[in-house]
Amino acid sequence: MKKQESIHTQLPGENVNTGFTASQIYYSTYQVSKLTSHLELHPRDYSSQIGLWKLLGRRKRLLAYLFKKNTGLYERVLTKLGIRGLKVKGR
């Protein structure tokens, strides 16, 4: 619970609505970090690797949606999380 509470405080506007795109990106980033640390300990856990790839794809789609709908919020989410942005043509 403590991790989720800290995630809620980092959300822009402290929006605790889990349907909010930014909060979904935060939660998926938290899951990615957990799976990444797990895979460092267990590099041959292929089912977890597949789950990580699916989660990364979902986060990428959410980031693309957020970029189209609200570019300012997209930039704030990237800076708060410290992740790379999407590869967008003409940018």
Swiss-Prot record:
InterPro entries: Ribosomal_uS15 (IPR000589), Ribosomal_uS15_bac-type (IPR005290), uS15_NS1_RNA-bd_sf (IPR009068). Its main location: plastid. It is found in: Plastid, Chloroplast. Keywords: Chloroplast, Plastid, Ribonucleoprotein, Ribosomal protein. GO terms for biological process: translation. One of its GO terms (cellular component) is ribonucleoprotein complex. GO terms for molecular function: structural constituent of ribosome. It comes from the Eukaryota. Pfam families: Ribosomal_S15 (PF00312). Disulfide bonds: none annotated. CDD domains: S15_NS1_EPRS_RNA-bind. Belongs to the universal ribosomal protein uS15 family. PANTHER family: RIBOSOMAL PROTEIN S15, BACTERIAL AND ORGANELLAR, SMALL RIBOSOMAL SUBUNIT PROTEIN US15M. Part of the 30S ribosomal subunit. HAMAP family: Ribosomal_uS15_B. This is Small ribosomal subunit protein uS15c. It comes from Adiantum capillus-veneris. The gene is rps15.
